[in-house]
Amino acid sequence: MKTLIKNASVYHNHRFEALDFLLEDGRISQMGGCEGERCDEVIDAGGKRVVPGFVDIHTHGAVGVDVNGADADGFEKICRFFASQGTTSWLCSVLTDTKEQTMYAIRMYKEWKNTEHRGANLMGIHLEGPFLCPAYKGAMPEHLLKKPDMELLKAYQEAAGGE
């Protein structure tokens, strides 16, 4: 599908400029010089600003959903919310937790990944702990911190399939 977005204020070359642009199959294929293009749809942006999508690399949850306890539907709810706010991609940051709860979060992420979904792209898992120095633990519960453990790390990596 080919869509022309016209009358947009596009962030391009480090500034906003009036530009029309083409989308083909959901991706920008051309910026400027779009007059005369045959399109399936034409959208007048009315001078609104268009910027690249934002990427959130550290998210513990949103819209009442905590990634440590989320099921696949919870991940989908977060994805849709982020997309509505201009975030196009994100990493779920699993807090330091028990092995069982961390494995649950990894399983639910994998379950979500194996379904059809919409909204922002959940790029993978960011394990925030449990291998942290107590002096730099921040808000992580100290009783759940662990000394480095390669077997546990391998178990998490295997469960996540490298995600």
Where are the regions that the model predicts?
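Histidine-rich, glycine-flanked metal-binding segment
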Residues: 1-51
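Conserved protein kinase catalytic core
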Residues: 13, 52, 62-64, 132-135
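General structural feature for long, well-ordered alpha-helical segments within catalytic domains
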Residues: 19, 27, 74, 78, ...
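Short clusters of hydrophobic/aromatic residues that line enzyme substrate/ligand-binding pockets
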Residues: 31, 65-67, 145
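Divalent metal-dependent hydrolysis catalytic cores, especially in the metallo-beta-lactamase
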Residues: 60, 76-105, 120-133, 160-163
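Metal-coordinating catalytic core of metallo-dependent amide/deamination hydrolases
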Residues: 105-163
